[in-house]
Amino acid sequence: IWREYIYHLQHDDNGKRYSTSESYISALKSLQKFLGKDAIKGFNISVVEIQKWKDCMTNGVKGKDGNIEGQISESTIGIYLRSCRTIWNVCRSQGYLLDVTYPFSNKKEKHLVSIPRSKVKKKVYLKREQFTELYNVFVNKNYPDTWKKGYAERAHYSLGLFLAQYLCNGFNLADAARLQYNDYYFQTGKRAFLFNRKKTADRSSNDSEVVIPIIEPLQVILDEIAATPSRDGYVFPEIFNGVTSEKERSKRTAEENSNIQDRVTKICHDVPGWGKAIRPSGTWCRHSFATNLRNAGVEKTYIDESMGHSTNSNDMTNVYLDTYPLEMQMEYNSKLLALDDESTQRDELISKLSKLSNQELLQLLNKAV
């Protein structure tokens, strides 16, 4: 049943939950590693075996050289046990294990396996002044001459994606990869995106819809690294690079996430000279979006809804747009960067000039003279 569950995650609905299957695969491998592949026959399993597995993950086991090996973090143990609990519940729903004591508990109870709670991660973020500095690096292409040939171009693209994640309401790269120039984009005069968060799309319908106002700095980035707008075309097609299977898409997204973190980290260290503790990732973008808007005095309801957090509304998008019309969204998201009007206008002018041909630029110069 466990393997069957993994199969369905990987293949149902064109494999759109492929990435979810990875934790179930790892959990099953861990169970077999510590208890042995043939230790459990059929449904002959109880709280004793599950507790033994947890103890092995917690304390490790002696290896061939006598050293302790196999210890994993409490958070990973929690992930594996929750995967096992899901499979146990599937078995019960199919009529199996009904006469076996339910082994799991979310708190420490005698004779039951307690599942560690996920630790609250320290929320790391960059201040809006730091994002503004990175944005100026992007606009001016201020990269070290000492970098190897071709690296600056790759780093520039990665920095653009990183900034786009921040300015696009802190969405993750899986959402960026699926972002399209859909009807809503054209209906708003190319001033906003509408998309469904991949993480919550399976659990809700309207609640996962997110509107992204395209403020001017975001447009500057799009002009530089995004695809030319075409109806239903991908905004950032290079992330998937044409692959269609969810397995390959998941792999491509993970690779691009790694590239972005490595390259943006190098930019942070080599250009503004920030400390080695700063290693920005997509998670930083999400935390930074929420933190910087909150510090700028933007109301929490807007922040939550613009990040796709669940609400009780039956039609979240319409309520959201009634409460926060596009102009107000533009105003709020403009607080994400510390740009004055003059620098914003300069960036807009640079963006427009970059689209002109050499002949058009020459005509402008002649007129100026």
Residue spans for each PLM region:
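Catalytic-site neighborhood detector that most strongly recognizes the C-terminal catalytic loop/helix
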Residues: K199-A201, M307-R346
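Basic, Lys/Arg- and aromatic-enriched nucleic-acid-binding interface segment
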Residues: G78, Y102-L173, A177
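Conserved tyrosine-mediated DNA breakage-rejoining catalytic core shared by Y-recombinases
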Residues: R178-E224
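Short, charged phosphate-coordinating catalytic segments
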Residues: N89-V100, Q165-G189, T301
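N-terminal core-binding DNA-recognition domain of tyrosine recombinases/integrases
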Residues: Y5-S19, K29-V120, K141-K148
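Active-site/catalytic core of tyrosine-dependent DNA strand-transfer enzymes
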Residues: F131-T132, P213-K276
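Short, basic (Lys/Arg/His-rich) helix/loop patches that form interaction surfaces
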Residues: N142-Y151, R231, Q261-E305, H309
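Short, low-complexity, charged amphipathic interaction modules
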Residues: Q345-V369
